[in-house]
Amino acid sequence: SQPLSDPAVLKNLTSTITTILAVERLDYTKGIPERLQAFAAFLQRYPQYLERIQLYQIACPSRLDIQTYQQLRQQVHTLVEQINSQFATASWQPIIYQEDPVSHDNLMPLFRQCQICWVNSLKDGMNLVAKEYIAAQDEQNAGILILSKNAGAAHQLQQAILVDPTNNDSMIEGLYQALTMTKQ
């Protein structure tokens, strides 16, 4: 399949599906398995969002020579497969997963195109993805940032919906809040 950042793919993002973007290194500090589990629990709790939302998870592998990172990669692949097989329909799958890195030039249009960005760091410094997502937004059609309270940027980005990346209910309700704020 084509990378999410491909301009042809960007044009195909339809207004009928709310797109949620998550982009980071495949690293245990980024809270990827926790986000995926919360996303599955969200779909279970709010089935009215089936076929109405899609998570674009971009996870660039790093340190794959280290066994714990290999195990994390396998865990993420397994979760994506399980969630997609549980909830997918003939015309929709809940998670699009990509490991190909995205260039900065392609990331900016992707930030503008996706209605929600979800940064779920378990522990993080400033987290530039959160700041870049906010900076890339068009004032007339700004996206919504779901941000881990453990990201350093959480203290500066007051407009973000803050979530606890270790608490499923916090993430589920943060996503619900973001979705009810987006223009449907």
Region annotations inferred by a language model:
Residues S1-Q2, L107:
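Extended catalytic-interface subdomain
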Residues Q2-I20, P47-L50:
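Nucleotide-sugar donor-binding and catalytic loop/hinge architecture
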Residues L13-T29, L36, L55-Y56:
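Conserved donor-binding/catalytic core segment of Leloir-type glycosyltransferases
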Residues I32-Y49:
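Short hydrophobic signal-anchor/transmembrane segments that target glycosyltransferases
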Residues F39-L43, V80, I134:
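A conserved amphipathic alpha-helix that caps or lines the catalytic cleft of carbohydrate-
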Residues Q44-Y56, R112, I116-Q184:
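Catalytic binding pocket for nucleotide-activated donors in carbohydrate/polymer assembly enzymes
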Residues A59-D105:
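Nucleotide-activated donor-binding/catalytic signature segment of Leloir-type glycosyltransferases, i.e.
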Residues S103-C114:
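Short acidic alpha-helix that forms the nucleotide-activated donor recognition element
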